[in-house]
Design a protein with these regions (language model features):
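Phosphate/nucleotide-binding beta-alpha loop and adjacent structural elements of enzyme active sites
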Residues: 1-216
Length: 216
């Protein structure tokens, strides 16, 4: 089943959906079309103006912030799905000014309703950002479609101090086995089956696919 079918299955009229890593709004518009009130997060100054142009007239709220454990602002090479920039023949991501926020604090400060559904596609930063979702796992318990970008442990491409590609649990990243403690299950859309809770929930190296995190 495609990810769009899952969006259609789990989005109910007037539900609240967050599109985290919204790019230029393709998914945000789909979520809106399925009946959700949509809040889109896209920090890249290359993408955000296009996101606003595509989405704000539809009633989608757009925020030019990225998520992290603590708030700060910086210049960093940033993975914005435009990897055509090269230095000395090596493809790199361009340096951009990025504003990081803590999601729980940002929600409170901006009076944003809590989500029923989250689409999370942030090019490996999910391995950090999911650590900040405990208030959601224990609270409103949204369904989360998370795109996982787990690179090999000996690979360092697109891995920047302020925008890491992937952080493994032993290095301080999110331990997906913690989902069991929050009474969440993981569904693999490629097979439409749940991962056995006796198995390791952490992705294998070179994993790049979506998973559904579903409260029991």
């Amino acid at each position: 089943m495609s990810e769009f079918n899952y969006y259609k299955q789990y989005i109910k009229p007037n539900s609240v959906a967050y599109d985290i890593g919204a790019h230029i709004g393709e998914i945000s518009i789909q979520l809106k079309n399925f009946g959700a009130d949509v809040y889109s997060f896209e920090p890249s100054p290359n993408n955000f103006p296009i996101l606003k142009s595509n989405c704000e007239s539809l009633g989608i709220k757009c925020f030019d912030v990225a998520l992290h454990q603590s708030p700060y602002e910086c210049f960093t090479r940033f993975k914005d799905c435009k990897t055509d920039y090269k230095e000395d023949g090596v493809t790199l991501d361009t340096v951009q000014y990025i504003k990081y926020v803590n999601l729980e604090d940002f929600i409170k400060e901006n009076n944003i309703p809590l989500p029923n559904f989250i689409k999370l596609d942030i090019e490996g930063m999910e391995s950090i950002v999911l650590k900040t979702f405990e208030f959601l796992f224990n609270g409103v318990r949204p369904i989360i479609y998370a795109e996982i970008h787990a690179q090999p442990k000996n690979m360092n491409n697109q891995n920047y101090p302020d925008n890491p590609h992937w952080v493994w649990p032993e290095d301080g990243g999110f331990d997906f086995n913690k989902l069991k403690d929050f009474n969440y299950s993981m569904l693999d859309p490629s097979t439409n089956t749940f991962i056995d809770k006796n198995f390791n929930y952490n992705p294998a190296e070179k994993t790049h696919q979506g998973f559904l995190l579903i409260p029991n």
